[in-house]
Amino acid sequence: MAAKIKKGDKVVVLTGRDKGRTGEVIQVMPKEERALVRGVNIVKRHQRQTANQEGGIISKEAPIQLSNVAVADPKDGKPTRVGFQVLEDGTKVRVAKRSGERIDG
């Protein structure tokens, strides 16, 4: 199945404590059906001290379920579903169902 959400996409969180927040996808994990989104789902982790890194509590992004995010429409930034369209030259591009705008280049 073709990837509807890719690294670098602007996405909107649909559910959870970060509902309505937008961010850029840092990493997609298709086998786990999860994605890392910059600035969303921040958790605190206790870091053990090592020779080159000091210990303490650090904040970092945790993966979020792909079903809980939607691609932001390039036109107005609202969440949209993703469709696919084949151009005349045979290339397949992602299209926002909401506005019909192309998501890929």
Swiss-Prot record:
GO biological process: translation
Keyword tags: Ribonucleoprotein, Ribosomal protein, RNA-binding, rRNA-binding
Molecular-function annotations in GO: rRNA binding; structural constituent of ribosome
InterPro entries: KOW, Rib_uL2_dom2, Ribosomal_uL24, Ribosomal_uL24_CS, Ribosomal_uL24_KOW, Translation_prot_SH3-like_sf
GO cellular component term, pick one: ribosome
Gene3D superfamilies documented for this protein: 2.30.30.30
Pfam families per the UniProt record, alphabetical: KOW, ribosomal_L24
NCBIfam families: rplX_bact
Cross-referenced HAMAP family: Ribosomal_uL24_B (MF_01326_B)
Record-stated family: Belongs to the universal ribosomal protein uL24 family.
Summary of the function given for this chain in its UniProt record: One of two assembly initiator proteins, it binds directly to the 5'-end of the 23S rRNA, where it nucleates assembly of the 50S subunit.
PANTHER family, sorted: MITOCHONDRIAL RIBOSOMAL PROTEIN L24 (PTHR12903)
Subunit details: Part of the 50S ribosomal subunit.
Protein name: Large ribosomal subunit protein uL24
Species lineage: Bacteria, Pseudomonadati, Pseudomonadota, Alphaproteobacteria, Hyphomicrobiales
Gene that produces this protein: rplX
